[in-house]
Amino acid sequence: MVQKSRNGGVYPGPSGEKKLKVGFVGLDPGAPDSTRDGALLIAGSEAPKRGSILSKPRAGGAGAGKPPKRNAFYRKLQNFLYNVLERPRGWAFIYHAYVFLLVFSCLVLSVFSTIKEYEKSSEGALYILEIVTIVVFGVEYFVRIWAAGCCCRYRGWRGRLKFARKPFCVIDIMVLIASIAVLAAGSQGNVFATSALRSLRFLQILRMIRMDRRGGTWKLLGSVVYAHSKELVTAWYIGFLCLILASFLVYLAEKGENDHFDTYADALWWGLITLTTIGYGDKYPQTWNGRLLAATFTLIGVSFFALPAGILGSGFALKVQEQHRQKHFEKRRNPAAGLIQSAWRFYATNLSRTDLHSTWQYYERTVTVPMYSSQTQTYGASRLIPPLNQLELLRNLKSKSGLAFRKDPPPEPSPSKGSPCRGPLCGCCPGRSSQKVSLKDRVFSSPRGVAAKGKGSPQAQTVRRSPSADQSLEDSPSKVPKSWSFGDRSRARQAFRIKGAASRQNSEEASLPGEDIVDDKSCPCEFVTEDLTPGLKVSIRAVCVMRFLVSKRKFKESLRPYDVMDVIEQYSAGHLDMLSRIKSLQSRVDQIVGRGPAITDKDRTKGPAEAELPEDPSMMGRLGKVEKQVLSMEKKLDFLVNIYMQRMGIPPTETEAYFGAKEPEPAPPYHSPEDSREHVDRHGCIVKIVRSSSSTGQKNFSAPPAAPPVQCPPSTSWQPQSHPRQGHGTSPVGDHGSLVRIPPPPAHERSLSAYGGGNRASMEFLRQEDTPGCRPPEGNLRDSDTSISIPSVDHEELERSFSGFSISQSKENLDALNSCYAAVAPCAKVRPYIAEGESDTDSDLCTPCGPPPRSATGEGPFGDVGWAGPRK
């Protein structure tokens, strides 16, 4: 069973496996790999396992595998020489200036060697100078070939061969070989041969060419010519046409009379010398025709031959200005990089962020803790002591306080109780003073490691161990310290805290290194890594904030315009940025509001691909889509309502009147089915009055046609409305036809005084109370669903109505109608309309076939209801 710890180590199981030995190598003389100072190793038989890339130390760290010092010096020297020869900066120009003076001196001496007065004196100096030049150039060439290996593309013999094929390297080897050959073959008693001197002069020109190693001059010329190639080609082409035409015409004019123009080649030579404004004067036209032609073409051709000079001059000026501006822009790189770095550290050192550790680790490696003070035991005074090295501290603790840093130590006799505790920084052991350790439980390492110090001291030879420390380490495997290296540069400046297992209430001041303290017991201590203190973190945070502000100010200063062109470019860039933002804003507005209809050609016929336009993703397009869906739903609802009306037999006029009502109708009152059933059982005749979808009047549900007819005296009305109509449907609650649901009339019809005929209908029902002969059978009445609609009209419709006015029922009369089913006459009929010429008080609805109604005599429960007076 293998258990992994938090630090990536592997702890062996208790059964059948070898125990690992954990120790600080370098503290114990007999420990393996004692050359590694302060390295905490896990000595075991297992091979080192492969770790991730993130867990590997940096290449520059001291803990990683260092290359030999010879290789490091080799690479460093190689890079240095390559930069001096190929990329000279600073003082490296001194060498190149020396080479230039050497080459220039050789050129001057070679010139003086051609003069008879100075020939003898210059030949001796030139010979010596040529030897020096050859030696310098030869050494420089081989150094260049060797130093080119610092570049990855020039490594190896193939890379060196590739570097040697460069144009300037070819020129170098040619000059070197030719100079050696000239000196070897042409020198006889320090006197050069004439042919050797001539070849040497030519080699001086090649030496001057090689002075521009980086080719900046040729690159600048090539860039200018390439940038203005069209203008140059145009000027040269027109100038060449002028040259040919002028030479040919002058040749024709001067051919027979001037000996200077015997051939067309002579005319071309004259034209070239004339148009380039050189004018040797060896050839010139003599006739007036030739002079006139020469003057005309000279005025035209000279301007075109002079154009390339102006084009190249302006191009060079613009290029130089651009290079200066580019250098000015390159100066912004360092402030920009510093601003980015300081901004990241300002962000990463936020104390509320707990997920960023690399920046704090950088400060843990680089921040040096200041000097700390301590009181000496002998003199009782305070003095400054530099920070101790980690290794020296651990050795002192190990040798003086009896610390054990090995998990499986060899058996040794336990120390006596009187063994002295010589730990100078142990705060858990009582001493002779009453103060705690002066380090205040924290010790920081010094920047440099003292590896070899104290190895041979007698303190390192005596090793004491604490049984309590060994027992605690064996009992709690989770407290095994992590495997980290003191020699690693990235961890060389970690902070340590000393924890004492015993109480520190009676602890006294520890002595400085070199002083002994007698103690009764050993000092079990534990070293664990600790982060930076909160105060130090706050200080680092403040420094990062200040650096960020300073970097921001420097970067703003570097953004100042260089010249007027820079200002114009900044304004142009701002204008382009503004236009792009306006375009983006316009696109967003178009996406929200929607674009207008696109202007298309009327004559152009739409193809099959253009028949269906894509959906508009804008808000207006979506609203249009929703509107179309609402219209589609409205059509579907109209279709369903029409089907329902046709199925139930509802006339369309009622629905139109209902939907045309100005005021919403209140909810109809609810009547229980039991009450309605009791009325039906008692009287067997029910008048169901409902409100249709288009009317506020009454509906009289009479017996179905299948019921036996009843002989009743006709009414005085000329046309009683007794024909049945099909019902509108069942009750909303799902009951049978006995349910009576009488909605209240609208608000404008609730007043009894609004119409004169409001009490007439109630009197008609009272008169029908004692006529049981006209009562239909109960079963037929329950199944009947016919109704007569009495629509309500306003004053405008009153004039257009058939009878001149209509009868409306008030709410009180409708309530009386529900409570007086037993008093309805058997042959009573409710007339929804009144004939022409008949008033509402002319006659009774039924002939006197029974006793007079109770309302006429004022007796009975409805005696207070009287007839309404005639309208006047």
Curated annotation (Swiss-Prot):
Residues 1-90, 146-163, 216-227, 315-872 are cytoplasmic. GO terms for cellular component: axon initial segment; membrane; node of Ranvier; plasma membrane; synapse; voltage-gated potassium channel complex. Residues 264-276 dip into the membrane without crossing it. Residues 317-539 are annotated as: Mediates interaction with calmodulin. The keyword ATP-binding does not apply. A motif (Selectivity filter) lies at residues 277-282. Changing residue 331 to A: No difference in PIP2 sensitivity. The modification Phosphoserine is found at residues 52, 466, 468, 472, 476, 478, 507, 672, 801, 803. Keywords: Cell membrane, Disease variant, Epilepsy, Intellectual disability, Ion channel, Ion transport, Membrane, Phosphoprotein, Potassium, Potassium channel, Potassium transport, Transmembrane, Transmembrane helix, Transport, Ubl conjugation, Voltage-gated channel. Residues 114-123, 184-196, 254-263, 277-287 are extracellular. In adult and fetal brain. Highly expressed in areas containing neuronal cell bodies, low in spinal cord and corpus callosum. Isoform 2 is preferentially expressed in differentiated neurons. Isoform 6 is prominent in fetal brain, undifferentiated neuroblastoma cells and brain tumors. Changing residue 777 to S: Found in a patient with continuous spikes and waves during sleep; uncertain significance. It is found in: Cell membrane. One of its GO terms (biological process) is nervous system development. Pore-forming subunit of the voltage-gated potassium (Kv) M-channel which is responsible for the M-current, a key controller of neuronal excitability. M-channel is composed of pore-forming subunits KCNQ2 and KCNQ3 assembled as heterotetramers. The native M-current has a slowly activating and deactivating potassium conductance which plays a critical role in determining the subthreshold electrical excitability of neurons as well as the responsiveness to synaptic inputs. Belongs to the potassium channel family. KQT (TC 1.A.1.15) subfamily. Kv7.2/KCNQ2 sub-subfamily. Heterotetramer with KCNQ3; forms heterotetrameric M-channel responsible for the native M-current. Homotetrameric; forms a functional homotetrameric channel resulting in the expression of a small M-current. Interacts with calmodulin; the interaction is calcium-independent, constitutive and participates in the proper assembly of a functional M-channel. May associate with KCNE2. Interacts with IQCJ-SCHIP1. Interacts (via the pore module) with SLC5A3/SMIT1; forms a coregulatory complex that alters ion selectivity, voltage dependence and gating kinetics of the channel. Each subunit contains six transmembrane segments (S1-S6) with S1-S4 forming one voltage sensing domain (VSD) and S5-S6 contributing to form one quarter of an interlocking pore-forming domain (PD). This is Potassium voltage-gated channel subfamily KQT member 2. It comes from Homo sapiens.
